């Protein structure tokens, strides 16, 4: 191939929602209200959302704005920690793990933004800066210093930092170990018959990897049928048939 992608969940900059709205029109999705919904959801302004983020370059005339926040905060870990809610903490970690798995199954090189490996949340200290440009720039909410005080916790089994870091290390090992993660592998999607579920398949030689990603907040069933073959869950080692999972 003539190129290799660098893939990331978050970086130093804002999220602009650069979606193909010409294509999305066929599904009745209009740009301005859809972006508003996304920005409201990821600020925790929608019922059921535990996300925490802030707007950047909000333009009320164009009804357009960009979003800022760390992966962990946008996935609900900050709110769960504030509430000291273990169930919500577990759900937030599951979201982070799912998104990282989606990152690692892509062709290319996964890039981890500093702090994401330990679930670092938003840093609001920029609002107290003596520098006007800094305190008026919400992008600094996800540009905080690395939390070295939390780094040792990644090696303590059961901590939030350990659960996130260990899962990422496992994904890294799998990406190096199995041929289907190679950049030359064939990649395609399978129909799941559920708009909240995405099934990505990768194949190289006689080896194949299938990833099923649930973007909802509840258990769903992917109505896929991969025949009578026995598959192994690369995370748990469990063996099963991939049919209605």
Where are these regions (language model features)?
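Active-site and adjacent substrate-binding regions of carbohydrate-active enzymes
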Residues: 1-245
């Amino acid at each position: 191939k003539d190129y290799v992608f660098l893939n990331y969940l978050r970086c130093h900059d804002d999220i602009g929602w650069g979606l193909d709205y010409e294509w999305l029109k066929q599904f009745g999705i209009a740009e301005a209200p859809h972006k508003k919904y996304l920005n409201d959801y990821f600020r925790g302004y929608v019922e059921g959302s535990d996300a925490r983020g802030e707007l950047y370059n909000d333009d009320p005339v164009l009804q357009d704005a960009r979003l800022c926040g760390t992966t962990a905060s946008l996935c609900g870990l900050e709110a769960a920690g504030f509430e000291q809610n273990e169930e919500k903490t577990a759900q937030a970690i599951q979201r982070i793990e799912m998104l990282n798995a989606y990152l690692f199954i892509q062709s290319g090189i996964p890039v981890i933004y500093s702090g994401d490996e330990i679930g670092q949340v938003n840093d609001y200290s920029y609002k107290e800066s003596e520098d006007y440009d800094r305190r008026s720039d919400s992008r600094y909410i996800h540009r905080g210093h690395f939390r070295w005080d939390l780094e040792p916790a990644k090696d303590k089994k059961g901590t939030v930092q350990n659960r996130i870091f260990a899962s990422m290390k496992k994904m890294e090992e799998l990406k190096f170990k199995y041929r289907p993660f190679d950049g030359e592998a064939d990649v395609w999607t399978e129909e799941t018959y559920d708009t909240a579920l995405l099934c990505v398949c990768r194949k190289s030689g006689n080896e194949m990897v299938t990833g099923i990603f649930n973007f909802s907040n509840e258990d769903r069933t992917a109505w896929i049928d991969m025949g009578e073959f026995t598959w192994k869950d690369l995370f748990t080692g469990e063996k099963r048939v991939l049919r209605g999972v």
